[in-house]
Amino acid sequence: MILAVGSPTGHVHSVITGMISYVAKGVQVADGQTRMLYTDFDGDGDRGVFLLNLSGQLIGWVTEQMEAEETAGASLAMPISEYKWMLEQLSNGVSIPYFGILGQDVSDSMLGDGIPRGVYITESIADGPAYSAGIQSGDILVRFGDQDISSLREFQGCMEETKSGDTVSVVIRRKSIDEYREIEYDVVIGAR
C-alpha cells in the first residue's frame, strides 16, 4: 500500500491510498532509461502528487494519468531512487548534463541482423547537443570519450561523470549502403 499526497483528488492537501500495480523497467527517457511505477489510482501529475510508503518515505511522484480505456483510473509515477544523483547535483547548485538522445541496448536479435553492439539511438532529440553535433536517429553510439559503450547503463554512467559545458568526443556507427561506418563527433554537453 502507498499514500498519494499533495492534491491527488484535485484538492490541495488531500490524501488517498493505493497500490503500485506494476513496475516497468527499461523505459526510455532522455539520456538513459528508468523504471516506471504504475499505480491503481487516478492521479494527475499536473496537480502535484507524491507517493509515500507506509513509513512516510518519499518513493516517487506522479507524472501523468493513463488515458487508454483498459488502464483508465491508473497513473504513472517516477521512482525517486532513479533520480537520486540528479537531485544531489541540483541541491548542490550543479546542473544536470544533457546529451539529448533516446536510446536502447542493441539486443541479440539486432546483433543477428548485423547491427553493431552499442546504444541504438531511437531519437536524436531536436535542438539537443547530440542533434546539433550531427548525430542522427538510427546511429549506434559505441564510444563516449575514452569509454567503449555497449549498453545504455554504461552511457548513463559516463553521463554522470560529465559536466555541462564539457566537450566530449563520441564515436557512432552509421549505416551506409552495405556496412556501418564509424564517425567521430565532438559534442558540447548541455544542461538541464
Positions of predicted regions on the chain:
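A short glycine-leucine-enriched loop at secondary-structure breakpoints
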Residues: G48-F50, G112-I115, P129-I140, E161-K163
